[in-house]
Amino acid sequence: MAVGKRIYLKRKMPDHEVMMQFKEIPASNVADVMERSCAMNPRIRLVSSPKAQMMVGPALTIKARSGDNLALHAAIDMAQEGDVLVVSNEGDNTRALMGEIMMALLYHTKKAAGIILDGPIRDIDEIGKWDFP
C-alpha cells in the first residue's frame, strides 16, 4: 500500500549560533562547498520585496503533489518562528499550492523566516509588497 503523506513530528534542530553564521554567507558559496547538492533551481525567483533578501532558519521540508496542498497546510500548522519552509511541487506549474491567505498565516501568525516554493502561487501582486522572503 502506498503512503500518501508522511509527517515527521520530531525535528532535530540545528545549533542557533552556527545557523546564524550562515546569514552572512552567499548561497552560491554554500552550494559550491556542498558540491552543488543544495543549489536551488534557477527558475525559482524572489516574488516579494523584503528589505533583506537573505533568510536563514531550520528547514521544514514539504513534498506536495500538483494541486494538493494538504501537506503544506500540515506544515504551516507545524511551523515555528524562524522556520524556512521548502516546498517541492515537483516543478509543476499548472496549479498554485498557496496564495495570500496561507502566506499571511505563515508570515504574520507563525513568523516564519521565509518560504521557497518550486511552483506557482496566487495573489502575487499583494504578496510582492510584503517584507517576507
What are these regions (language model features)?
Residues A2-P133:
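Feature captures the catalytic cores and cofactor-binding loops of soluble hydro-lyases/lyases
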